[in-house]
Amino acid sequence: MIRFFFFSLLMFSTNLSFAQVDSLILKNGNIIVGEFKDMDKGVLTIETDYSDSDFKIEWEGIKEIYSKTKFLITLSSGTRYNGPLKSSTTGSVIIDDYTTGEEEVNLNEIVFLKSVDDGFKSRLYANIDLGFSITKANNLRQVSMRSKIGYLAERWQADASYNNLYSTQDETDAIRRIDGGLSYKYYLPKDWYVPVDLTFLSNTEQLIDLRLNAKLGMGKYFIHTNNAYWGFAVGASYVNENFSGDASDKNSLEGYFGSELNLYDIGDLSILTKAVAYPSITESGRWRADFVFDTKYDLPLDLYLKLGFTLNYDNQPVEGATDSDYVFSTGLGWAW
């Protein structure tokens, strides 16, 4: 009774400063009132009126949660909802979906929350990180940038990315590598999804002026929890390649299969690895592969440190080019 009275009083007292009051009760009995921004990778972000910085709360430490905010909600099963949520008297969570009505789920089934309204801005997200290195030997200078912006809807997600690396040193040609693209995912029941990608690569090391790659496939998340996710995708791609020098341009069809693993239940550190293989359909014996390994350490104020490794391999490169190229980068970034 005392806790209920205190809880009600706290919600009333903060109502003057928040257009929408959300609240939760932790397993240790503490009560936090504020505005839920999102929950991703097992961490809930809360904006409060009594702190200059947002609170980060481990999802597994929450006992009860109450909110009338409109959320995009994803369960570990891949089921998606759109609406507010509140804890029930039985210890589960009731989601009031705007389409299907009330659904009762376990709290630990929820793996993603994002507070949204009917505006475009609330569904956007972005990040950018920059790196710069100087080495006295050979007067090496290297500048790198990695960036991404995306939009999340109820049943689909779209992203655009752009990455650039430029390196110079004495007695050798400058090295430039630019890559990026557009990607789209349509989410199906039970954590299946349809990926559509259009990517580009320009790489002086492999004598690639421009490689365009259009992909269509089918994927599934086999693990999707507050500790990690692991997915696999297969499909087909069309490749158009323009090379430096006298090498002829190429157009080819490829199959592809790839996997992605993200681990994030390790404090402020997260690890992301992706591997994709492209066996050619129209060029006998040719196959390509892309590999990405990123580690990210979260800092205050939405800043982060990132350490990344990227590898591109082609077993049939054009004459005069190497069969592989890799990038090792470090940078300071900001996420929004």
Question: Language-model segments: what does each one mean?
Answer:
Residues 19-163, 179:
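Compositionally biased alpha-helical segments
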Residues 127-129, 144-146, 177-181, 193, ...:
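Membrane-embedded beta-strand positions in outer-membrane beta-barrel channels/transporters
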Residues 128-134, 147, 160-164, 180-182, ...:
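Transmembrane beta-barrel strands of outer-membrane/channel proteins
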Residues 132-136, 153, 164-168, 200-204, ...:
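Transmembrane beta-strands of outer-membrane beta-barrel pores
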Residues 150-154, 185-187, 219-223, 260-264, ...:
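Structural signature of outer-membrane beta-barrel channels/translocons
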Residues 154-160, 191-194, 226-230, 262-271, ...:
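Repeated loop/turn-to-beta-strand initiation elements of outer-membrane beta-barrel proteins
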Residues 324-336:
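Outer-membrane beta-barrel "beta-signal"
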